[in-house]
Structure formats: C-alpha cells, structure tokens
Curated annotation (Swiss-Prot):
SMART domains: SecA_DEAD, SecA_PP_bind. The keyword Coiled coil does not apply. GO terms for biological process: intracellular protein transmembrane transport; protein import; protein targeting; protein transport by the Sec complex. This is Protein translocase subunit SecA. ATP binds at Q87, G105, E106, G107, K108, T109, D501. Belongs to the SecA family. It comes from Acidiphilium cryptum (strain JF-5).
Length: 910
C-alpha cells in the first residue's frame, strides 16, 4: 500500500528516467529547422565535422543532440521516415547502455539508427546483433542506405562468408550479424596462428535486437566449435533397444516433469543390468562399477531421450535428421545438436543414422560473450518481467518506452476449461465468429503437435487457414505478410523473434515485391496502383472488424512469451483483441499450478463444456509463471557462477595466446619454460633438505632422457662429493641449453623463431581442449559433494584451479620436450606454417546446459608435415610397483589401470 502511494507521489524509477530523457528532446528538436535548410552535401559533411570534434576531445554525449538531429533529417530524405519523439528517447536509452522496451510496431529498427550513427563516429565499430540471417541482411540493406548517405560503411556477417569478406565486414563502421556468427567468429579467431588471420577487431559497442531472446532464453546454451571424434556409434542403437523395452514399465524410472529429470528406480537398475548382460554388453561387475561408466552414460541418455523428449514438441525428424525445435520461437534449430550423446540417443530412438559425437575445441556462452563488450545495449518488446536478471547478470537497466499512440488492444481475461478438447472446441467457435465479421485471427500454440491438433479441427470445419511452425519454416515471411488480411486465420507455434510485423489489411511492401517482379516493366505502374487500393480497402475492413484477434491456446512458462504473442495485435494504435484459452490438462496448470486449483475451480462453478472466467485465475496463473521464472533465473545464475570459473581461465588463455602471436620471438618464454621444467624435475626427484641417499638420481636421469632426449651422467654427478640440487640443476640446464643452441644453429634463427611459436601455440590449443573436457567431467559430478556437506561451487573453483595449474605445468614440459625432439626431414625454408582448418570443424549451439560433456578423442599436437618428432617412453614404470609410477608421462594412461590419465589419477596435483 505504502509503495503504491509513494509511486503515485514521486513516480517510478522508469518515470524519472523518462523525465530526464524528455528534457533532451527539446534540444534535439531545436536543430531540426536549421538542418532542414542544408543541401545533401552540407548534411553529409556533418559526419566529418563530428569526427573532427571527437578527435579534438569532445565527448559522444556532447555530440548527441546534434548527431541525433542529423540522423533524423537524413532518415527523412533517404528512407522517407521521421523519428518520433519517443523514438528519440529509445535512441538515448540505447546510447546510455541500457535496454529499451518498445512495443511491437514502434519502429525498433529505425530507433537503432540513432545510437548506431552516433557511436560509429568514433571509428571503433558498432555491432548490431539480430536473431536470424534474414533480419541481418534486411536491416543492413534497408538502414545501410541511411548510413551510406551519411558517409559510414556497413558490413553484414552471414554464414558461408570467407575470412577476407568477414574481415572487411568487421572493418566497416557498422556490422550487422546474428549472435551465433559474432560468437563463432570470436572462437575461431582464438584458434588461429597469426594476428593477420583474425577477422574481428577489438570490441566497442553492441546493440542486441530481441535482447531477451538472446541474453535470457539462449543464455544457458554455449556456442561450441568441435572436431570429429573417433567414438563408435553402434552402442547407441544397442542400448536404445534395451531402454525402449524398459520404459514400457513406468515403475522402472522416476520422472520429475517440473525439473525435467529422470532416474532409474532400484527395479529399473536391476532390469537394465539383466538386459545388458543378456545382450553381452555388461560382461563383468555391476552396472555402476567404474569400468562400466560408458554403459551408464549411454543408458541415462537413452532414458532421457525416451521419457523427457517428445517428437514434434522438442524436435522433429526431417530428411532423416533429428532437428531441435526452439521452445521459445518454434523455429527449427538446424545445425544445432544436443551435446553429451543425447542427440545420438534421439537418433537411435527415431531409427535414423546415428552421427558420431564431436569433441569440443572451443566454447563460450552468450552470457560471457556479450559481457566482453565495453558498452552493451538492447531492445525488445518484452523486457520488464526480466529486469532483475538483466540488472544482476549484465548490469543493464531496463527502460519502458511509451508508445507513440496509446495501445487500443483489448485484452480479455483467461477462459479455463476442464479438458483440452473442450478448450479447442471453444477456440474453433471463436475463430468462426471472427471470420464471419472478416476479423483476422492469430492462434498461438506452444508446440507443433498442438498447432496440428487445431489445424485438423479447423479442416474438419472447413475453415481455411495457414500454419506457421517449424515444418513450414520456408513459407514464414509469406504467411506472416498475409496474417492481417480480412478473415485470415493463422496458426503459429510461438511468435517470439519472428521479426515481421502483422499489418492490418496485409503487407503492402511484400505484395508489391512478390507480384511486380513477375510483371513486365510496362505493366507494373497500373498493377501497383491496384495493389495499393486493395490493401487500403482491406485495411478499412479489418479496422472496422476490430483489428487482429490474438488467441493463446496455452500459457507459456514465461510471461514474456505470452506478452510477445499479445503484442502482435494493436501495433501503432491499431485496434485489436487478445484472449487466452486454458484447460486443467495444460502443462503449466498440471505441473506448476497449485494442487488446489482444480477443487477451487469446481467451487467457482466449473462444469463440463463450460468456461470459468475469473480474475483470481489470472492471478493464480501469474503466480505460477513467476515461480517458474524465478526457478529458471536461479538456474541461469547458478550456471553462470560455474561458467565464470571457466570464463576467467578462457580469458587468461586467449590473452596469453594473443601475446604469443603478437611477439616477434617467444624464445624468452620458451627458455623460462625449459628452466621451470628442469627445476620441477629436480625438485620432484631431489626434495629440499633430503639426504643424498634419498635422492632418486637414476629416475632423474630417466626424466631428462624422456623429456629432452639426452642421456646425461646424472647418477655420476649426484655421487660427487659436495654437490647439491642447485649444482645438478645448473649442469642439466647447461647440457639442455647447449643441445637447443646446436639445434637452433642447424635450423637457422628465422625458422627457429617460427618453430618455437607454432609449437607453443599448437601445444597450448591441444592442452586447452583437454582442459575443457576435464572441466566438463568435473562439473558433471561436483553436485554430489553436497552430500558430504561441502559447497559444490567452492569445490569446483578449487579443483578447476588445480587443473588449470596442472595444464600450465604440462604446457611447459610438452613444449620443452617437443622442441628438444623435433627433427627436420627437408629444407627448413619449405616447411609450411601451422594451418587453421575450419573445414574439419563444426559449429553448434546445443540446446542443453553448457557443462554437458562431450567425449573427446586424444590427438597429439599437429606439427608441420616435414617435422618428425622422436619420442622416448620411460621403461622403468612397473604397474605392480607404485613407487615407479612417478616416471609416467602426465598425459599417459595411469599404470593403476583406472583408464584415467596419470595427471588426473595418481599424478594429480594436490
């Protein structure tokens, strides 16, 4: 009560922000009259003037009023559009590094031109991030006319571009592209071997369109670059046949729909063990013995595929492939795959070809990618419901921009029915009623399956309609363009991120484009006049009928997605209406609704075939949605804490990598690595203050031979009177440095510099890839530490740091060893530089958590073909004598027989 009184007196924080922005509008408008008198050349000259003023020390904030006014004047001349005052506010919000919430149809694309123009004046580049390639190309071409008029260059990043074209696009003042393309280019750049090969420049400023979709809905899933693995795929089909039989009995597993988890019961474990044994897959021990970990993994993923994932809801099968469906947009996510073997389990379930798993080479989440920009802003029609998350994770404030014309849409209360069939009948009846008065209808569904239920129902009633879901992705633009025509009925699987407005009467631009290009030039003017008249007449009919009627057939988990659907109606002051039809069988009502909802509705008078309309229901549903949103926020926040550990290590590795590439020579770094490696060897075999008889001098000689390929009289040196560990270290160092100096003299200084740098970079890449896998495995099991009363996050941080430290120690030893062993089989001048090979890699954005591991293979660092490395393996390791295991190379299998690498087992850093 008191908070509402306070808001009424002093206003909300949003009101106060708008008040401050409105004060600047008068200043911007004050330039309009003078700029209107300038000819085109004088107006275009303003860009050079602004750049000179920036170079002289003036700030972008000081330039803002005049720069915005220049951009508006240019838009009037080039695009025939003038920014409204509320659009100026939106532009200022974006320039200030905030999120502008603007309703559908309020001209977000035009709003973005203001801060884009202003920030591009610095020459440091502006990235405009869209949700799909169509919008990136459309907006770059459309708004590019304005930027080119003002003397700014525009680039666009789309799939399939060669590196030279990408580099040119990033070098432009303004670059349009999708979130995926920007992120993948960042990862690819950090896998290259020369700065000149990179395509991106330093980050400056990004504006993210549909910011809620990219930074919230897709925040949990990482971008991954991977290479092919040698793992066989037959086991997926074998396990699938067993699990398919198992799940016929619901007592064999426990499923939690709320948290989307499934586990075998005790009965299920016994049954699956028996079936695996009968199939010859489980040959010794029980299912949960350490050497059967692969079987457990395959069984769990197959169980998830059969019980948690539904065809035509979570994925579709098209052209022999399992294609994921985005739960927020209903789009096919072609090219994306679930990670950690889940996609292979789905392929086995659907009897299509099981593709090999891929091994992760590099990955990053959108949360961490977009936090790399010094300045970030975004725009969307629905952000206020997630304002807390934007603020806490991205430090982005949300400002709700008022509409230019008040919203005239009428939002009806939800209608609740007992069963889904009753609900669909009511939806069909309302559609028929709307068609009789020629009112267009947009029906929103949450899955392909449900859109086809409604489509079949309308077909039985002979009601013509269009279906917009992942199956008909190609016809999307044409379907949306006609969705506002008189009497049109369109069924859509979620309208989030569709990017195309539904205009009352039909889309004039789309019709002109599609119809006129088929006609000869002479016939076009007459047909254009006819189309314009038809669209105008249709607009009047639809306007009189009440505008677009949006029908929601189910509440989504997120209020934001419901608001996006509603927002398709009532754009720019048009009339419209919306209503949601629900049933007690809907997922949200069934899983998250209160157990008391059913009995309460009966008390309110809910009967078969009738609907209940009551404000209490709306409040109860909103409460359920808030509960789900809070849970999802906590999940994302928790995942970010874990990902931040990897992110800090990633930033360190990538920064170090760039330092190596930037350096003329890395000889000093390599020299320090050799010195550290020798010091570690000596320290391990001759601990400080140890007696001479405790020295492991023979083992030290073995280490030197294994790492550096040198047979030194270490045992004899150690037997000398008065020698200590520092003298031993110096003698070994002198011998190793003499060996390396002779090698450098043989190779020549130029080639030695090239060799040192390429081996250093390739070894770092190889170890980083291994480290990513180790972190994945660590993350998967770390939650169990909670049972031991230990904080999993703190445990993860400590162990991840130990793994990172071990990786850096491995780097020193491996680089030193490879350089010591490398020999040339031909003239050094002909040896090629290490190559970055994108053709052998895959980009993916899997629809699962960023820590779902992928089984990685174990390739060695790739050297140039003419370099032959002679390796040495210590022969003194005896699996039956643990005291000899210390000579085991850190990346070799542990002699204990666990199957793990030595460095993760008995050689683990503690």
């Amino acid at each position: 009560m008191f908070s509402s009184i306070a808001r009424a007196i002093i206003g909300t924080s949003n009101d106060r922000a708008l008040k401050a922005y409105r004060r600047r509008i008068a200043e911007i408008n004050g330039h309009e009259a003078a700029l209107a008198t300038l000819d085109d050349a004088a107006l275009q000259g303003k860009t050079s003037e602004f750049r000179d003023r920036l170079a002289a020390g003036e700030s972008l904030d000081r330039l803002l009023p005049e720069a915005f006014a220049v951009c508006r004047e240019a838009a009037k001349r080039v695009l025939g559009m003038r920014h409204f005052d509320v659009q100026l506010i939106g532009g200022m919000v974006l320039h200030d590094g905030k999120i502008a919430e603007m309703k559908t149809g309020e001209g977000k694309t035009l709003v973005a031109t203001l801060p884009v123009y202003l920030n591009a004046l610095s020459g440091k580049g502006v990235h405009v991030v869209t949700v799909n390639d169509y919008l990136a190309k459309r907006d770059a071409g459309w708004m590019g006319q304005l930027y080119n008029f003002l003397g700014l260059s525009v680039g666009v990043i789309v799939p399939g571009l060669e590196d030279d074209a990408r580099r040119d696009a990033y070098a432009a003042d303004i670059t349009y592209g999708t979130n995926n393309e920007f992120g993948f280019d960042y990862l690819r750049d950090n896998m290259k071997y020369a700065l000149a090969d990179m395509v991106q420049r330093d980050f400056n400023y990004a504006i993210v369109d549909e910011v809620d979709s990219i930074l919230i809905d897709e925040a949990r899933t990482p971008l991954i670059i991977s290479g092919p693995s040698d793992e066989p795929t037959e086991l997926y089909n074998q396990v699938d046949g067993i699990v398919k039989q198992l799940v016929e009995d619901p007592d064999t597993y426990d499923k939690d729909e709320k948290f989307k988890t499934v586990n075998l019961t005790e009965l299920g474990s016994e049954r699956v063990e028996q079936m695996l044994s009968e199939a010859g897959l489980l040959t010794e021990g029980n299912l949960y013995d350490v050497f059967n970990v692969s079987l457990v993994h395959h069984t769990n993923q197959s169980l998830r595929a059969h019980t948690l994932f539904t065809r035509d809801v979570d994925y579709i099968v098209k052209d022999g492939q399992v294609i994921i469906i985005d739960e927020f947009t209903g789009r096919m996510m072609e090219g994306r795959r679930y990670s950690d073997g889940l996609h292979q389990a789905l392929e086995a379930k659907e009897h299509v070809t099981v593709e090999r798993e891929n091994q992760t080479l590099a990955s990053i989440t959108f949360q961490n990618y977009f936090r790399l920009y010094p300045k970030l802003s975004g725009m969307t029609g629905t952000a206020m419901t997630e304002a807390d998350e934007f603020d806490e994770i991205y430090k982005l404030a949300v400002v709700e921009i008022p509409t230019n014309v008040p919203v005239a849409r009428k939002d009806g209360d939800d209608e609740v029915y007992r069963s889904a069939d009753e609900k669909y009948e009511a939806v069909a009846a309302l559609i028929e009623e709307c068609r009789q008065r020629q009112q267009p209808v947009l029906v929103g569904t949450t899955s392909i399956e449900k859109s086809e239920i409604i489509s079949n129902l309308l077909n039985s009633r002979k009601i013509p309609h269009a279906v917009l879901n992942a199956r008909f992705h190609e016809q999307e633009a044409a379907i949306v363009a006609e969705a506002g025509a008189p009497g049109a009925v369109t069924i859509a699987t979620n309208m989030a991120g569709r990017g195309t407005d539904i205009k009352l009467g039909g889309n004039l631009e789309m019709r002109l484009k599609t119809e006129l290009e088929r006609l000869p030039e002479s016939a076009r003017p007459a047909r254009e006049a006819e189309i314009r008249a038809e669209i105008e007449a249709a607009h009047d009919i639809v306007h009189a009928a009440g505008g677009l009627f949006v029908i929601g057939t189910e509440r989504h988990e997120s209020r934001r997605v419901d608001n996006q659907l509603r927002g398709r109606s009532g754009r720019q002051g048009d009339p419209g209406a919306s209503r949601f039809f629900l049933s007690l069988e809907d997922d949200l009502m069934r899983i998250f609704g209160s157990d008391r909802m059913g009995p309460m509705l009966e008390k309110l008078g809910l009967k078969d075939g009738e609907a209940i309309i009551h404000p209490w229901i709306n409040k109860a549903l909103e409460k359920a949605q808030k509960k789900v949103e809070a849970r999802n926020f906590d999940t994302r926040k928790n995942l970010l804490k874990y990902d931040d550990v990897m992110n800090n290590q990633r930033k360190e590795v990538y920064a170090q990598r760039r330092e190596f590439m930037r350096a003329e020579s890395v000889a000093d770094v390599i020299g320090e690595m050799r010195a550290d490696t020798i010091a570690q060897m000596v320290e391990r075999r001759i601990p400080e203050k140890a007696y001479a008889e405790q020295w492991e001098s023979a083992e030290l000689a073995e280490d030197v031979k294994r790492v550096f390929g040198l047979e030194l009289p270490v045992v004899d040196w150690a037997a000398e009177e008065g020698i200590d560990e520092s003298h031993l270290r110096e003698r070994i160092s002198e011998a190793v440095e003499a060996h390396m100096a002779a090698k450098a003299a043989n190779f020549g200084p130029d080639f030695m510099r090239f060799l040192e740098k390429s081996i250093l970079l390739q070894t770092l890449d190889h170890l980083w890839k291994e480290h990513l896998l180790a972190l994945d495995h660590l993350r998967q099991g770390i939650g169990l530490r909670a049972y031991g009363q230990r904080d999993p996050l703190n445990e993860y941080k400590a162990e991840a740091f130990a793994l990172f430290t071990a990786m850096l120690e491995d780097l020193k030893e491996q680089v030193s060893s490879v350089l010591a062993h490398v020999e040339l089989g031909s003239d050094p001048a002909t040896a090629p530089a290490p190559a970055f090979d994108p053709a052998s890699m895959f980009t993916s954005h899997p629809a699962s958590g960023p820590y779902d591991g992928v089984a990685l293979a174990e390739p060695q660092p790739t050297l140039a073909p003419e370099m032959a490395v002679s390796t040495y393996r210590a022969e003194s390791v005896d699996p039956n004598r643990p005291e000899t295991w210390a000579s085991t190379p850190r990346n070799a299998a542990c002699p204990c027989g666990s199957g793990k690498k030595y460095k993760y087992c008995h050689g683990r850093v503690t």
